[in-house]
Amino acid sequence: MSSDGERDMARKPIRRALISVYDKTGLIDLAQGLNAAGVDIVSTGSTAKAIADQGIAVTPVEELTGFPEVLDGRVKTLHPRVHAGLLADLRKPEHAAALEQLGIEAFELVVVNLYPFSQTVKSGATVDECVEQIDIGGSSMVRAAAKNHPSVAVVTDPLGYVGVLAAVQGGGFTLAERKMLASMAFQHIAEYEIAVASWMQSTLAPEQPPTAFPQWFGRSWRRSAILRYGENPHQQAALYSDPSACPGLAQAEQLHGKNMSYNNFTDADAAWRAAFDHEQSCVAIIKHANPCGIAISSLSVADAHRKAHECDPLSAYGGVIAANTEVSLEMAEYVSTIFTEVIVAPSYAPGAVDVLSCKKNVRVLVASAPLRGGSELRPVSGGLLIQQPDQLDTAGDNPANWTLATGSPAGPATLTDLVFAWRACRAVKSNAIVIAADGATIGVGMGQVNRVDAARLAVERGGDRVRGAVVASDAFFPFADGLQTLAAAGVTAIVHPGGSVRDAEVTAAATKAGVTLYLTGVRHFVH
């Protein structure tokens, strides 16, 4: 072993500890263990009281500093007799000599956790109450100890207390372990400071005029899982979650099946969002982030699944299924006959998971309904794109605001199918054409680089079912050829955004074919 490796593995005995915690979980067991091992404990405020109340020897920090706690506890540990003991690098003889000259003892261990700032904000507390939960002394002690990791070990999580006691019994932490603890401590501080800075920016100093895109924004991410690989086996991948965000698919509970893959997550996310684009019971079947089928039903979720599957049974093989309502036993029995990678729903009826679990590999997830709002992030080389999610909530998404360009007004059943097709189209990669009937997609043309090819693909997939169906297009028809392709296949009504310089030609083609044509004034590209 090299000399550097030997230094990393050498243990530094723990003789003196500084403890100051808001979260008292595990505190007494820790203090008892340290006391039994002969470690001197210095502590603050309520932490010192909790330790002393158990008959455990503890030195209040004010005895160390000779200065009382002041300003409602805002100043307790911000004192040279504390921070010199934290920051003295005992590898340097001059630091050790300075401590001896000043009569200051060094600490080998710091145990600190911070005021619950984020929890206070989420509770709806007042601005002043939130400000009081911005930790100053605790953050300073953690940063000082982490900086001085050659001499001090720092622990910020009660889950680490077992390791502390094991290290004390084993002769102390190694330098390698102290480096790891220091890294974890700075991660903890960074996450905390990002939360404070974000709140300050949005609450105390919002930009004027107000904007959804501030000059600065910060987020912290925690690794939730290392995945088998990325989109392809030669790519490494992992899942990270935002601890400050509301629960989403990344926090889904897996009830059965193999570990989720990268592609499972991307497809499940697309399916989950597509299913919740609709108010009725809806099932979306997704593969490669595109719909194999989407359907709604007023009868049952099983009926919605049956209709979604019938759209494209061949492509649905090995797909990902999402339902926006509880999966019934009937639906589970149908799904169990089909090779399925993932099924995700808000809940499952009694017995449904047992039926699905007969297939050992299918991943069965429970996830909360996706929350509206937030931001979508997409990395680009050297930067990051941010946009508001496309949520089908514009005026143009309401059929009451559609413009009838030509043809007879759609009857109730036809209009219902047009609305369904329009909402389903949001989930399809552009250029997108969705042909629908009876609350179900029957032909989907997706991801084409021109709209007429998307129309041809949708017609080909729909086959004989296209006659009498309706169509939604995610963007305008730039030429009449796409609409003519659909009209020749027998569709009766089409909805599209409009806005092309050739809108008049497209409308004339619809009039000639006897097709009802609506304009929404809003598009729904997906890239």
Curated annotation (Swiss-Prot):
Which spans of this chain does the record mark as coiled coil?
Answer: none
Hydrolase found in the keyword field: yes
Q: In which pathway does it act?
A: Purine metabolism; IMP biosynthesis via de novo pathway; 5-formamido-1-(5-phospho-D-ribosyl)imidazole-4-carboxamide from 5-amino-1-(5-phospho-D-ribosyl)imidazole-4-carboxamide (10-formyl THF route): step 1/1; Purine metabolism; IMP biosynthesis via de novo pathway; IMP from 5-formamido-1-(5-phospho-D-ribosyl)imidazole-4-carboxamide: step 1/1
InterPro entries per UniProt: AICAR_Tfase_dup_dom_sf (IPR024051), Cytidine_deaminase-like (IPR016193), MGS-like_dom (IPR011607), MGS-like_dom_sf (IPR036914), PurH-like (IPR002695)
* The keyword Transferase appears for this protein: yes
Q: What is its EC number?
A: 2.1.2.3, 3.5.4.10
Gene Ontology BP terms: 'de novo' IMP biosynthetic process
- An annotated GO cellular component: cytosol
Catalytic activity reads: (6R)-10-formyltetrahydrofolate + 5-amino-1-(5-phospho-beta-D-ribosyl)imidazole-4-carboxamide = 5-formamido-1-(5-phospho-D-ribosyl)imidazole-4-carboxamide + (6S)-5,6,7,8-tetrahydrofolate; IMP + H2O = 5-formamido-1-(5-phospho-D-ribosyl)imidazole-4-carboxamide
Q: Which UniProt keywords apply?
A: Hydrolase, Multifunctional enzyme, Purine biosynthesis, Transferase
Q: Name one GO molecular function term.
A: phosphoribosylaminoimidazolecarboxamide formyltransferase activity
Q: Which Pfam families match?
A: AICARFT_IMPCHas, MGS
Stretches assigned to the MGS-like domain: 9-156
Q: What is stated about domains?
A: The IMP cyclohydrolase activity resides in the N-terminal region.
Q: Which family does it belong to?
A: Belongs to the PurH family.
What is the name attached to this protein's record? Answer: Bifunctional purine biosynthesis protein PurH
Which organism does this record belong to?
Mycobacterium leprae (strain TN)
Which taxonomic lineage is given here? Answer: Bacteria, Bacillati, Actinomycetota, Actinomycetes, Mycobacteriales
- The gene designation is purH
